[in-house]
Structure formats: C-alpha cells, structure tokens
Amino acid sequence: MFKLIEKNTWKRKPYFDHYFGQIRCTYSITVNIDISVVMSFKNKNRTKLYPLLIYVLTKAVNNHEEFRTAINDKGELGVWDTLLPCYTVFHEENETFSNIWTVWNDDLMTFLSNYERDMEMFGGNYGIDAKPDTPANTFPVSSLPWTTFTGFNLNIFADGSYLLPIFTLSLIHI
C-alpha cells in the first residue's frame, strides 16, 4: 500500500524541497559492513549467502520509512508500507542477468523459502524480467561477485524522481 505524504505538514518538507527542487542531485555511498553473523548463520544452516544478504537489506529498508519514500506513477509523494526486493540473477551460460522479485516476509525461513521457490520457478528464465509482473513497490539489489570495489556509483538517467535505495554488492572477502 502506498500512503500519500501531506507535504505541507511533513517535517521533512524543507529538506525535500531543498534537495529535490533547488539543488537537484543524486547520492551514492559505499559502506563496508561486517557480515560475520550472517556468515556464521550461513555455515551453520548451510544456506546460500546471496538470499541472506537480500533478506538483511530488505529488513533494513523496511525498518526505515526514509528508504520507502517514493514518488508513484501519478507523481505523488508517499511511503510504501512494505518494499519487496528485486534482485539480479546471473546466467553463466550466456553472461547475462535477469531480475526476480520475491514477496517479503519478516520471518527469515519463510523469506528463504519464498526465494528458493522463485529461483526454482524463474531462475532459468532469460530476459530482463525473469519473473513477470514486477510490482511498483520493489527496490533493486544486484551483485558483482567477481570483483571487489570500494566505491560504486549508479546514475539513473531520468527526471530525477527515483528515490528508493539501490544496492550493489561486491565480492566478499572473509
């Protein structure tokens, strides 16, 4: 569900107007995070790392209204109650990737089950959207697991109204 923001009473209005209207710009930040707890869980439970990281990112995004603030297809400012991850899946056979989205569930094991089901059903599909009907309340997660980087900047060439976070993961050194 997308809840409209009443801009005139919104506490962030002056900041939004300043950065969205006066000095239009984009932001990019690269953060190194400690995933030792995630790795411990992965090894103990024999799960895959990528879906665990997608879960952690989605949980963080859904815990912060600022990350769920968006402009809908009607040009209205609002907040999604929940965002779903839309992540890339690499196809080694032809060196392309596809997007798959997964229904969010705060319970880790349920989310991992949803992820595995989506991978079984859509992971072998080629083309940009392996799973059809991507909902509007998704945010992108991708991975470049063959390279390490300490900075990454993705510029969306559009009208500048895309506000949701975009995550790109690199090779992980343990």
List the predicted regions and their residue ranges:
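Short amphipathic alpha-helices and their capping loops
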Residues: 1-22, 79-84
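Amphipathic alpha-helical interaction segments
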Residues: 60, 64-68, 122
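Small-residue-rich loop/turn and linker elements
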Residues: 67-100
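Conserved small/polar residues in nucleotide/adenosyl-binding loops
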Residues: 172-174
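Acyl activation and transfer enzymes in specialized metabolism, enriched
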Residues: 38-63
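Short amphipathic alpha-helix starts
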Residues: 25-39
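Helical lid/core segments from catalytic subdomains that handle acyl or acyl-like groups
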Residues: 24, 91-151
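Glycine-rich active-site loop/lid that clamps phosphate-bearing ligands
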Residues: 143-166
